[in-house]
Curated annotation (Swiss-Prot):
Belongs to the MHC class I family. Residues 299-308 are annotated as: Connecting peptide. The chain crosses the membrane at residues 309-332. Glycans are attached at residue 110. The lineage of its organism: Eukaryota, Metazoa, Chordata, Craniata, Vertebrata. Residues 337-362 are annotated as: Disordered. It comes from Gorilla gorilla gorilla. Keywords: Disulfide bond, Glycoprotein, Immunity, Membrane, MHC I, Signal, Transmembrane, Transmembrane helix. This is Class I histocompatibility antigen, Gogo-OKO alpha chain.
Length: 362
């Protein structure tokens, strides 16, 4: 079985959060597909994860002993066997479609048979505070690079290269944008509203961040101040550094928001400062769960060590998420992402259980 390097998976997963921000008061439902070929080691591995806002609610992995879509959120336990049966069949059909697409794309790019390749897809819809359709999106990627994207008008495509233009012409001839637009404005919105209602206790909560600062000597003359925010939900958060009240954006090292493994998120921002000048620097934290923004300043008497146990536990859980849900995480490393090949085929009717009836063929 082909193994994707952990660092690659971390990048994929963290990328999910970077560009899936919704407009204020809006909600989104997104699906992330990843298919990885492994020549000589069996069928490609197909993984799908679904998110409502920042919460994963379903998962499917073709490598499971008995591949079946599984719930990943409490409210999904309400769905009956018909829901899971139908969506499991959708995913199995998608896995076979992707297997063909991997061969097609390999031909488009004149690649040898021995290499491992990856197809990724992100698609979904977003509703405003009133529950009405706001926008839809679909992005495909091949081997980690943009391939083709459905434009915001949901009527036209942007192809990344000559190979993707072949797919674009096929999809235009088949009027796939029209079919996708109907799905996004109809089925997708209907199921998003249902999940928002059934999962409101989880999805409408706000967990404020637990914050602290750590100090790490770099040399005799410099030290790194790192501002931590842990255990917050939703994922949207702002960490900024100031020196004497002036923003230090250019000098700030900032990591993407990452899952903590327990339904909450983590993030840190760091600056390198002259030793002895730490008091001139402040970290400012803004989050929906805070009554007002927080301001942190390094106190020499405070403990300089990071709560390693908590961080490691989060990373271990993150690893579990990646191994099974991974993926998808795909792209959206700042609006990059999405891509794949071949042409669409309708894998299920518009009343499919979760509205994940977007599948492709080459």
């Amino acid at each position: 079985m082909a193994v994707v390097a952990p660092r690659t998976l971390l990048l994929l997963l963290s990328g999910t959060l970077a560009l899936t921000r919704t407009w204020a008061g809006s909600h989104s439902m997104r699906y992330f597909y990843t298919t990885m070929s492994r020549p000589g080691r069996g069928e490609p591995r197909f993984i799908s994860v679904g998110y409502v806002d920042d919460t994963q609610f379903v998962r499917f992995d073709s490598d499971d002993a008995s591949p079946r879509e599984e719930p990943r959120a409490p409210w999904m336990e309400r769905e009956g066997p018909e829901y899971w049966d139908r969506n499991t069949q959708i995913y199995k059909a998608q896995a076979q479609t992707d297997r063909v697409d991997l061969e097609t794309l390999r031909g488009y790019y004149n690649q040898s048979e021995g290499g491992s390749h990856t197809i990724q897809r992100m698609y979904g819809c977003e509703v405003g505070p009133d529950g009405r359709f706001l926008r839809g999106y679909l992005q495909d990627a091949y081997d980690g690079k943009d391939y083709i994207t459905l434009n915001e008008d949901l009527r036209s495509w942007t192809a990344a290269d000559m190979a993707a233009q072949i797919t674009q012409r096929k999809w235009e001839a088949a009027r796939e944008a029209e079919r996708l637009r109907a799905y996004m404005e109809g089925t997708c919105v209907e199921w998003l509203r249902r999940h928002l209602e059934n999962g409101k206790e989880t999805l409408q909560r706000t967990d404020p961040p637990k914050t602290h600062m750590t100090h790490h000597p770099v040399s005799d003359h410099e030290a790194t101040l790192r501002c931590w925010a842990l255990g917050f939900y939703p994922a949207e958060i702002t960490l900024t550094w100031q020196r004497d009240g002036e923003d230090q954006t250019q000098d700030t090292e900032l990591v993407e928001t990452r899952p903590g493994g327990d339904g909450t998120f983590q993030k840190w921002a760091a600056v390198v400062v002259p030793s002895g000048k730490e008091q001139r620097y402040t970290c400012h934290v803004q989050h929906e769960g805070l009554p007002k923004p927080l301001t942190l300043r390094w106190e020499p008497s405070s403990q300089p060590t990071i709560p390693i146990v908590g961080i490691i536990a989060g990373l271990v859980l993150l690893g579990a998420v990646i191994t099974g849900a991974v993926v998808a995480a795909m792209m959206w490393r700042k609006k990059s992402s999405g891509r794949k090949g071949g042409s669409y085929s309708q894998a299920a009717s518009s009343d499919s259980a979760q509205g994940s009836d977007v599948s492709l063929t080459a």
